[in-house]
């Protein structure tokens, strides 16, 4: 199911932990749609370069299986771990920070990917936190 021009529901709910159900509920699906729209904005800021999604929505079971916290924004469909093949994670983080995107968090994780998120609620103001792990 296409959520936007470049992002599908399958892509944003994919997991290698196929033994667990990773189907979002209605509220999570709405967040995933907002996330897909936001990723389109990120793609524009990055000059239209392809964005590879490593991980986005995670059901509780999937989130537990990967050892993430219950408070992870992935749990509710508000975060994605991405790679941009022609850019380093540092370049992605810098481009996002320099933009006027309404990101909640942008995190360079282990110099392998970039975690990017939107506010948990549509009406909530973004925190605009930038971190390096």
Positions of predicted regions on the chain:
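Glycine-rich, flexible loop/turn motifs
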Residues: 3, 62, 71
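Catalytic cores and adjacent binding grooves of peptidoglycan-active enzymes
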Residues: 71, 76, 80, 84-133
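N-terminal start-of-chain detector that recognizes signal peptides
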Residues: 25, 51-57, 86-91
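Amphipathic alpha-helical interface surfaces
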Residues: 31, 35-38, 62, 78, ...
């Amino acid at each position: 199911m296409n959520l936007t021009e470049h992002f599908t529901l399958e892509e944003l709910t994919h997991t290698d932990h196929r033994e667990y159900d990773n189907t979002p509920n209605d509220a999570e699906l709405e967040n995933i749609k907002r996330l897909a729209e936001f990723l389109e904005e990120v793609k524009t800021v990055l000059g239209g370069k392809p964005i590879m999604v490593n991980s986005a929505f995670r059901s509780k079971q999937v989130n537990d299986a990967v050892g993430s916290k219950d408070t992870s924004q992935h749990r509710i469909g508000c975060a994605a771990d991405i790679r941009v093949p022609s850019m380093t994670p540092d370049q992605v983080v810098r481009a996002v920070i320099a933009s006027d995107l309404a990101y909640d968090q942008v995190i360079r994780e282990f110099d392998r990917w970039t975690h990017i998120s939107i506010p948990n609620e549509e009406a909530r103001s973004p925190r605009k936190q930038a971190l390096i792990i």
